[in-house]
């Protein structure tokens, strides 16, 4: 397992040794069919070296799609899933890369790992608690708000971080303290400081996570009242009227309203508590 994780650390070769880019694209065309279980499990971890590949056809179209396909198809072994979690956790809390691809895609793949653990538990309570902390801390440290670029593809750090929060919030083995930490972290990105205007669906992704954390019923009314009071506060503005006098204020107003609208829609569309698993899919 340690050797598997080491092979996936930042700086690992992309494509992995002995594999060409043409091989990776052929893997996608084959719908990620790898007959040998051992080969598939080794390749899964080695693909993490391509998380920051500048080509979206590789980064998104092969790496993410392959790992998502295998994880959802229960085609990876528990040791491999553990190695993925360990490597991705280290990546998320490691150095930021200039192009800005590595961390958002580490969060996105880790959301699939967290989903696998939610469906069939793999991790110990201690590892899962550590994953909650990494999800919260990594979301709070996002300061690259680039979304989609027509040639470079997606970055989408906040949305991918929210996807990870969602999977953990849905997990019945994540208790109230973990949910509280996840919601406090999410609140920091609903209306980030600066002239940041969300235009790539970030409010919707955060709203889904919040709705289903709320529906777990583990956080009391006092918590949610304080949480929404913080969201409704105009600070650092003197009042909401002041938002119209500066670009940063307009961004705060725009993002706060976008989140509240998304939250209202998610609350109506999400259905009953019995729909949690389907929505998490």
Annotate the PLM regions.
Residues 173-267, 271:
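Long, repeat-rich segments with strong aromatic
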Residues 14-33:
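Short N-terminal segments immediately surrounding and downstream of signal-peptide cleavage
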């Amino acid at each position: 397992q340690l050797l598997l994780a080491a092979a996936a650390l930042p700086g690992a070769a992309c494509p992995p040794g002995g594999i060409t880019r043409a091989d990776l694209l052929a893997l996608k065309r084959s719908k990620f069919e790898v007959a040998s279980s051992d080969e598939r499990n080794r390749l899964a971890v080695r693909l993490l070296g391509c998380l920051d590949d500048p080509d979206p056809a590789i980064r998104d179209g092969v790496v993410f799609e392959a790992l998502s396909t295998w994880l959802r198809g229960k085609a990876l072994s528990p040791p491999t899933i553990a190695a993925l979690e360990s490597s991705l956790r280290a990546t998320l809390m490691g150095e930021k890369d200039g192009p800005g691809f590595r961390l958002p895609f580490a969060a996105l793949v880790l959301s699939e790992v967290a989903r696998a653990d939610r469906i069939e538990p793999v991790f110990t309570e201690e590892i899962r608690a550590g994953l909650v902390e990494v999800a919260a801390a990594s979301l709070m440290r996002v300061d690259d708000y680039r979304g989609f670029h027509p040639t470079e593809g997606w970055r989408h750090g906040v949305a991918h971080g929210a996807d990870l929060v969602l999977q953990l919030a849905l997990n019945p083995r994540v208790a109230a303290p973990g949910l509280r930490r996840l919601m406090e972290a999410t609140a920091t990105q609903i209306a980030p400081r600066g002239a940041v205007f969300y235009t790539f669906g970030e409010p919707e992704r955060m709203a889904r996570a919040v709705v289903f954390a709320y529906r777990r019923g583990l956080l009391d009314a006092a918590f949610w009242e304080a949480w929404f009071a913080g969201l409704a506060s105009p600070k650092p503005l003197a009042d909401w009227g002041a938002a119209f006098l500066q670009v940063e204020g307009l961004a705060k107003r725009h993002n706060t309203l976008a989140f509240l609208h998304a939250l209202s829609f998610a609350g109506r569309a999400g259905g009953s508590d019995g729909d949690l698993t389907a929505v998490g899919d």
